[in-house]
Amino acid sequence: MKRNILIVIFSLFFFLSFARGSEEKNEYTEKDYYEALKDNTFYINFEDKKYLDRIFEKEDLNNYNIILIGENHAVSVNYILKFEFLKYLHENYNFNHLLEEIPISQAFLINLYLDSGNENILNQIKKHTYKTYFCTQEHFDFYRKLYKYNQNQQQEKRISIVGADVEHQPILAYAAMYSIIREKEDLNSLSDIKILLEKLVLKGEMDKDIYSIAQKCDKLIFDEEMGESLLGKKDFQLLKLINDNILNCKTLYGSPQNEFNKKRDKMMYDNFRILDNDKNKYFGIWGNFHVWQFQVNGLLPFASYIKANKSYSDKILSIMVQYINCMYANPQRDYEPEKIENKMFYLQASYQDKLEKNKGNLYIYKLNYKNSIFNKMNINGKKAKPGETFITDLYQYLITVKDSPACKKIDFTKHSK
């Protein structure tokens, strides 16, 4: 995907600049990095809460309403990080929403699954997301695990999903719209929408242009007052939002390649603002570029829009992940495992071995502590000049993952009904 190529290039550029050490003036040395990290490197142990408490003991996570981790997709360990951090934040800091890099309609359908446990919903999503990074065994097993977790929570304490992406799979979006409207009676002028959606969802009948249904629906839902009286305000606004999001997808995929990332992240932020409730607290794992809190090379990531919002300017925390000797599942090659390595702060062995001592394959660096060199370092690993972006302007922690396998190819026979 376009964004993954961008991030890999950036990571390699950063590491090559960093790895030269003190060959150039104004560079930090390997010893500088080691001294900066030796007291700020923590083992991640999800089996004992005190390890996580120690990582964040000087942070006070109560101050944050949004915490985002930046991943490379389809690495198995991502789903361990996702579930365990979500559970920790939910149980200790009342984070009640999982903010996902998925379309609004998919979040709606997954919330239906979390309410019912109906595997047919997941099967429907699997069918239409095959050949994407989000159609792996771990991805759907995560939702099953979340469903079981929620069953042990009081109704009002259960975690729900918020999706902010555009509708990359319009057929799934139409299925969600039909789920909203199918039980409604006396729809008057909106009955034409129900007929259009029934033809597609139940009979498989569709025009050559997959977006034509959304265009027809758009003409039928212009009267919001009438729509809200027929469907109720919440359902009508969701129906309209999903339909608008389908049309946004058409606009996005019709854009020049160099405009794709710019437009997509702005569209995702606009969706988030519509869906946001200031009482919510969000945790999510997104593609790594999206969690940066400041523009890079003229590109504004999703999190940078949130950071610029006065309501969230000091309430968002970003955590990056670097992968050492890991594998990911490549959906373009039928989910074959391929190597991924994006070293960002990884020192020569004489120093790195000391940092990793007794820390296993999963540990985290705190970068934003008082008087940290990372608060003075530009994105190329050099001492920042006036006006340059600091590393900690982008993200404040860095997780190191070692030796993770790739996600598994989905088994379409498992859980099918």
What are these regions (language model features)?
Residues F10-A19:
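Hydrophobic h-region of N-terminal signal peptides that target proteins for export
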Residues A19-I66, E119-I121, K148:
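N- or domain-start disorder-to-order transition segments that initiate the globular core
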